[in-house]
UniProtKB/Swiss-Prot annotation:
Site (May play a role in transmitting local conformational changes): D102
Gene Ontology biological process terms in this record: L-methionine salvage from methylthioadenosine; L-methionine salvage from S-adenosylmethionine
Name of the protein described by the UniProt record: Acireductone dioxygenase
Binding site for Fe(2+): H97, H99, E103, H141
Species in which this protein is naturally found: Pseudomonas fluorescens (strain ATCC BAA-477 / NRRL B-23932 / Pf-5)
Length: 181
């Protein structure tokens, strides 16, 4: 089940609120300019499925999102616990970073924890299959796929080169719960 935990930066061990109803999650994130939506992930794909196979399986949704948002590139993160580079890939997302463009993730299998650092709050969004999250350019965030990843997410960007992050240098991400905590 998707959830949203909202923390003040001064209390990373105790959320101010925890939401589990889709409408409440979407409304709370919308107040911060974050789109959270449900899109049916009707084709079953397993973590480890190739990028080409995932995009082909979801071509209609990809085309719709690319047109709707004016996105220039699409890729897929598809990992299971047996992936040989899982620790390296996980580490690349765990530090707080920003993008100069919007980032959209459509979860078609598994789950991941998307943390958004906005002003004095951290919005920890547990995303699962059927969840779509759109993070505006410049929003500080980090992502945790867990020690034993199990996820397939389609990612879209305005930048034709795809995922390009700028680290903030803030160690805040290390203070907050991880996916497996």
């Amino acid at each position: 089940m998707s959830s949203l935990s909202v923390y003040h930066v001064s209390s990373p061990d105790l959320p101010n609120k925890v939401l589990t109803h889709f409408d409440d999650i979407a409304a709370t994130l919308a107040e911060q300019g974050i789109r959270f939506d449900r899109w049916p992930a009707t084709t079953r794909v397993a973590p480890g499925t190739s990028q080409q196979e995932v995009i082909c399986a979801y071509q209609e949704q990809v085309d719709r999102l690319m047109t709707e948002g004016g996105y220039a590139s699409v890729d897929v993160i598809s990992l299971d616990e047996d992936h040989p580079r899982k620790a390296e890939l996980r580490a690349s997302f765990l530090d707080e970073h920003r993008h100069s463009e919007d980032e959209v993730r459509f979860f078609v299998a598994g789950r991941g924890l998307f943390n958004l650092h906005i002003d004095d709050y951290v919005y920890a969004v547990l995303c699962e299959r059927n969840d779509l999250i759109s993070v505006p350019a410049g929003t500080a965030h980090w992502f945790d796929m867990g020690e034993r990843p199990n996820l397939v997410a389609i990612r879209m960007f305005n930048n034709p080169q795809g995922w390009n992050a700028s680290l903030t240098g803030d160690a805040i991400a290390s203070q907050f719960p991880r996916l497996d905590d």
